[in-house]
Amino acid sequence: VGTGRRAVVAGYLDILRARHAVRLLVGTLVGRLPNATAAIAIVLFVRAEGGSYSLAGALAAVYGVANAVGQPVLGRLVDLHGQPRVQLPAAVLSALAMAVFAFAGTGTAVLAYVAVGAAGLFTPPLEGGLRALWPSVLGEEDQVHTAYAMDAVAQEVMFTVGPLLVTVCVSLWSPQAALLVLNAVGVLGALSVVVSPPSRAWRSAPREAHWLGALRSGGLLALLGAFLFIGMALGSITVASVPYADDHGGDAVYGWLMAALGLGALVGGAVYGARRWAGEPARRLRLLVALLAVCYLPLMLMPGAVSMVLLTVLAGVFLAPCIACAFVLVDVHAPRGTVTEAFSWLVTTFTVGASVGTGLAGPVVEHGGALWGFAVPGAAGFVSLLVLACTGRVLAAPARGAVVAASSENDPNRAVEPRFSSGHQA
């Protein structure tokens, strides 16, 4: 056990020792704080202004939809024009729009909706940009895939810590200050990334002019279809946990359940990224999604609070490994010159899926209770597995003109031949 633990730590330390790695990872996480905290910050601000929960939910939904639309569009612009020219202006515009919302309040509904929508639309695609940078920073395929797992784990930590930071800002100052401070900090994070040498040097490979961009890849479309349902599973758990918590201790239990879900993903991602995996990534993803779906099923037992927390940890274990493995497949299937856009589409699809899952689980819980609410994630997980099974051939074969990790996508000289292929180890 001690040897395995040392191997886990050593694998991640090797990544963090690489030049610029810590700066890029931390800068990206800080830069994404506004996105990770937007929903709760908007709700708390609207309520403090005297607005209704319906208005708060509607504004948060507008932010989410605008963000889902903006990520792939901005990702395509990054591929065309480079990271600094797109990421920093987008971050500034997003922060300014949120500042307009913070100072104008909800008195003029139209202005509030426009400001929140603009903030979501211009959220910079830092997540996709970081994944495009890892090959040029690390160079070795195994390290790139470990970095993807570390990246997935870091995102789980951020989305767990982010809401806590909002509550701290609100308790120290006000909901308005929380909006302003977190978005200002987000701009600093984006600035830290785009002025770094890897970000300034990165150039996308030449791309074929096509209005579909990354979506012309059948393999990427199959992956997006599968992750739409994985997002639905995650979103439905957050809703189904509410009535369960109401019957077993209230808000404190709900907080423990959400923390347990994040803890499971953190542990699973850390262990997954610490070893080298042989075989086809597509086949491994099918196995991981199958395990993810199976681990959702015990939630329907709805035992006491302590046991339920443990089951929720189990439910989260395979989430980060699924995401990390999907990153590898995005590398394989993204058409040349579209890597940032392709990663942004994965983020968008997962986010949209979570929103759909939240919306679907609401009526299910209302009519059938928490039991049927917890049936939704298991069902969504198995539908995701079905999508992967039906598209196995497409996912197993890289698309024509696809870019793999550490290919010319990250070569300033735009060499034609990639340095290695994802087909042997991932």
Residue ranges with predicted function:
Residues G337-A370:
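A late C-terminal transmembrane helix in Major Facilitator Superfamily
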Residues P124-L138, S241, P321-A334:
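Intracellular juxtamembrane helix-capping segments at the cytosolic ends
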Residues A115-V157:
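Cytoplasmic helix-loop-helix junction between adjacent transmembrane helices
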Residues G70-Q83, V170, V267-P281, V365:
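Helix-to-loop junctions at the C-terminal end of transmembrane segments
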Residues A282-A326:
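C-terminal transmembrane helical hairpin of 12-TM major facilitator-type secondary transporters
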Residues L29, A109-L126, L228, M308-P321:
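Hydrophobic core of transmembrane alpha-helices in multi-pass small-molecule transporters
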